[in-house]
């Protein structure tokens, strides 16, 4: 019990959570009952040795399956976070989904901030595998949201159709989406929407709850790439993130639909700056300005984001730790995309290719979603600059191929950026 209340208090500057003694007694009774249920289930599992519970991962191709061993599983299986989240809950999405046709997935999620410490013996090697060798035990994350440092941020708009930068943020003291209760999810919505109401100028806007939105309006926002898709992704469904859908989910956007915040999808929040065309520097400037203001407004209300110097910003999927940043463009590459050197060029530039509609889609009319592969080991400014330089290189290659000229595979980028 002390651990649970400690987590809640850690996320608040104020102790107003326990203002009403009567409701406090009811809350205490409810939490005790919930913990008793979890404890009973957990004790039942201990009747079997860990070897009897070890998942069959022989046909799997994800980071978790590569890193998990019977010894690690035996050591961690019976551990729980203060919120009652287990190793098996962390890895279930990777057990249920052996691999992905387009990208290599992580194969596990965190249920709360403490998951990354309690189950560090599996999370650390997974993080190292996913993030190009970043070691969370010996390295520190560096944050830099100074958009003035960006250079050459205007793309050739004959090729680049749109530009986008996004990140995620989690509210400290509340469980992450795989483990959150309805009450916690609604609290996330309340905290974030209340804070967003304080945005001014070109950032001011309105919140649209999915609960009150028609199917037609939802689909239109999805088709226009403003709103997250319906919960059909295996990551969401197998990890328990689609529970109670669409309760306490929604989208906030400014009047121009160039600054958006998703609430309670894969993460507590996703903060997005986007616009048509190729002005990535302007997109990133708005992103930095808006994100800083959102954090200020969150703190003003007694909350804070999950962060530590080793992991950076803490999010549900280990792939989004560190900056949580994905800077991407929709770019037309009809010739380069058919060149056998294309995958190696992307690899050396530390870029990732997705289909036109995202990770689970194919390219339409040779339009690809190109973004940074890394999230850790480099700052936000460094990652956006990598995308700018890399996409400009891809466009130059496309132009050369149009003229019948040869192209070269660039040398690989250094493993990490600023120390």
From Swiss-Prot:
Its EC number is 2.7.3.2. It holds the Pfam family ATP-gua_Ptrans. Keywords: ATP-binding, Kinase, Membrane, Mitochondrion, Mitochondrion inner membrane, Nucleotide-binding, Transferase, Transit peptide. Transmembrane segments: none annotated. It is found in: Mitochondrion inner membrane. One of its GO terms (cellular component) is mitochondrion. The keyword Nucleotide-binding applies. It is a peripheral membrane protein. One of its GO terms (biological process) is phosphocreatine biosynthetic process. GO terms for molecular function: ATP binding; creatine kinase activity. Residues 159-401 form the Phosphagen kinase C-terminal domain. Residues 1-39 form a transit peptide. Disulfide bonds: none annotated. Expressed in the leg muscle and heart. InterPro entries: ATP-guanido_PTrfase (IPR000749), ATP-guanido_PTrfase_AS (IPR022415), ATP-guanido_PTrfase_cat (IPR022414), ATP-guanido_PTrfase_N (IPR022413), ATP-guanido_PTrfase_N_sf (IPR036802), Gln_synth/guanido_kin_cat_dom (IPR014746). Belongs to the ATP:guanido phosphotransferase family. Reversibly catalyzes the transfer of phosphate between ATP and various phosphogens (e.g. creatine phosphate). Creatine kinase isoenzymes play a central role in energy transduction in tissues with large, fluctuating energy demands, such as skeletal muscle, heart, brain and spermatozoa. Exists as an octamer composed of four MTCK homodimers. This is Creatine kinase S-type, mitochondrial. The gene is CKMT2.
